[in-house]
């Protein structure tokens, strides 16, 4: 919305949110088409990472019924991902004992204190919040099966894997969905400035790689 209004020059967004914005999906919070948006580059994938306390009894998406679950800040990319995955799995927020709209860090603290049973976090692999949780309590990473991903009906959601040992205690690969992130700008930004920004990023990939593990997925072919 800020880019559409010309109140910024660059943003990082999930592919499904970008599609919703471009098409004016009111259910996702976009009452008008954001037709001034322009793509700059693909970056890295967000992975749907649903993590439960090992003693919660949660092993599948269906087991989330009757449980206390955090889905990220309201209307955030993570929360939109949660809605899409739950709907495809035949679940709704009303099926849960409690839904919390909390940032990653706060969700983890509540799980440590046994005030939440599970959290859904859409982020790069090895996200710090889940690494922190996994060192404090035993966790289970809940799979998102391929048939659920297909039912979402959005090409932005791709079948992917959270590799074994991404988190402490996670000894097996876990199937999930991944959603690409894109850098976007708007039509009012001069082409020369867009070129310089893009060039600067790709000439400094080593710096990005050193700053964040997820950035290693950014390649020139993006």
Question: PLM features: what roles do these ranges have?
Answer:
Residues 1, 5-7, 86, 114, ...:
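N-terminal secretory/targeting leader peptides
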